[in-house]
Design a protein with these regions (language model features):
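N-terminal amphipathic/basic leader segments beginning at the initiator methionine
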Residues: 1-27
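Mg2+-dependent prenyl diphosphate-binding active-site environment of isoprenoid biosynthetic enzymes
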Residues: 17, 27-289, 295-308
Length: 312
């Protein structure tokens, strides 16, 4: 095993708890009128999930803060989070959840199961599901507009996140090309565009925005961007593999859907073994990018290794 499993489990558990506390505070109560939309938003946000994007955001902020305050060799895990960064992480999770709600709709992936429970449109109907996704997106930007960092950093973060969720090299653009590539023989350029845009873009923005929140320099942002792009692509490659090798019960979502829909995936192009090798190579690249930060980067490196060894 290439990472400290116990440490990663602790980071994931504490990160999920911190994100959930803030999400509970920020989301309207289920009893708030109009109740249907708020129940649907909460159904999807609190369905479980790894909270990977908030955790990466918070840990990037912790690393940059540790490096800037005490020097890169000063120890990593004991460093404190930049005050208020949890709100930024919560906004990123809202955006991620909105994308899942819309991806699951009949017009797109047509999925019935997400995080081990009925998808939003199965529980509340398509109309409310569409609106719940829209509502999470708009609330995310309301939260981003109020995060507690200098105005210049706040604007840069909003720009970064908006680009990552948009049409040019962003989440929506990746989804469009993914739809267009169905039932066609995949090529590497198209496959990389889909995965880098649809998945890696928001993961990258999570890491970069966490660094920006903590006062990252231009050089820091460049390193964080390379790290985020590398682990984001590795994450999606592993997702492609798990879709073929795990059951629906293990994944908490319908297994085998990519193959059935003839989607462009790394296993379809390279096979499972080579896909795993490529994911591992990307993780090594990501970790090497953070060597500048010494022990302060240990948690982000451990998280990168976790991403390729996870089973769901």
């Amino acid at each position: 095993m290439l990472y400290c499993d116990a440490m990663v489990k602790q980071v994931l558990e504490q990160g999920r708890e911190a994100a959930d506390i803030v999400l509970e505070q920020l989301l309207p109560p289920a009893s708030e009128h109009p109740t249907a939309i708020h129940q649907a938003m909460r159904h999807s946000v609190f369905a479980g999930g790894k909270r990977l994007r908030p955790i990466l955001c918070m840990e990037a902020g912790r690393m940059i803060r540790a490096a800037s305050v005490a020097g890169a060799q000063s120890g990593s895990h004991a460093g404190s989070l930049p005050a208020g960064i949890e709100q930024l992480g919560a906004a990123l999770e809202m955006l991620h959840t909105y994308s899942l709600i819309h991806d699951d709709l009949p017009a797109l992936d047509n999925d019935d199961l997400r995080r081990g429970r009925p998808t939003c449109h199965k529980a509340f109907g398509e109309a409310i599901a569409i609106l719940a996704g829209d509502a999470l997106q708009t609330q995310a930007y309301e939260v981003l507009a109020q995060i507690a960092c200098p105005a210049e950093a706040r604007v840069a973060i909003i720009r970064e996140v908006a680009h990552a969720t948009g049409t040019i090299d962003g989440m929506i653009g990746g989804q469009v090309v993914d739809l267009e590539a169905e039932h066609k023989k995949p090529d590497l350029a198209t496959l990389e565009y889909i995965h880098r845009s649809k998945t890696a873009a928001l993961i990258t923005a999570s890491v970069v925005s966490g660094g920006m929140y903590a006062g990252a320099t231009v050089a820091d942002i460049g390193r964080l961007r390379t790290y985020g792009q590398s682990i984001g692509l590795a994450f999606q490659i592993v997702d492609d593999v798990l879709d073929l090798t795990q059951t629906s019960e293990q994944l908490g979502k319908t297994a085998g859907k990519d193959k059935a829909a003839e989607k462009a995936t790394y296993p379809a192009l390279f096979g499972i073994e080579e896909s795993i090798h490529q994911a591992e190579t990307l993780v090594e690249k990501a970790c090497a990018e953070l060597n500048e930060y010494g022990e302060a980067a240990s948690t982000l490196k451990d998280l990168a290794h976790y991403l390729v060894e996870r089973k769901k």
